[in-house]
């Protein structure tokens, strides 16, 4: 069984910077983390986590953005009842210096990440 799983994973990788999936990927969970202004808006009740501190307890906006990314990933993993090591790839991006907040925020999860550099189009590209 382990050998078959290893072969399947190897078949997904094509070249040094591209992958091809044998089975189409799909979304099994999602999470949203916002600041107080978003939480007070008309969609407020739909967010998974709303912080009353717009800097999420961090010293800088950059660190706050990283914390938001990390919290969203941790919440999504929890909702799906899976562990970070069960995730093969993470596709992520942000509006801050083309992915620095995302890469720093999810670093501790140790999930291989594809950085998406499209600002607002990141969600559509993923």
Question: Where is each model-derived feature located?
Answer:
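Conserved "HGTGT" condensation-loop signature of ketosynthase/thiolase-family condensing enzymes
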Residues: 1-114
């Amino acid at each position: 069984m382990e050998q078959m799983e290893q072969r399947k994973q190897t078949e997904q990788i094509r070249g040094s910077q591209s992958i091809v999936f044998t089975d189409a990927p799909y979304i099994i969970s999602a999470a949203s983390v916002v600041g107080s202004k978003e939480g007070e808006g008309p969609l407020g009740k739909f967010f998974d986590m709303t912080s009353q501190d717009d800097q999420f307890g961090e010293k800088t906006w950059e660190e706050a953005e990283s914390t938001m990314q990390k919290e969203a990933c941790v919440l999504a993993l929890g909702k799906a009842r899976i562990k970070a090591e069960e995730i093969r790839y993470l596709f992520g991006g942000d509006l801050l210096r083309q992915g620095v907040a995302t890469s720093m925020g999810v670093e501790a999860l140790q999930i291989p990440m594809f950085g998406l550099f499209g600002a607002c189009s990141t969600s559509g590209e993923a």
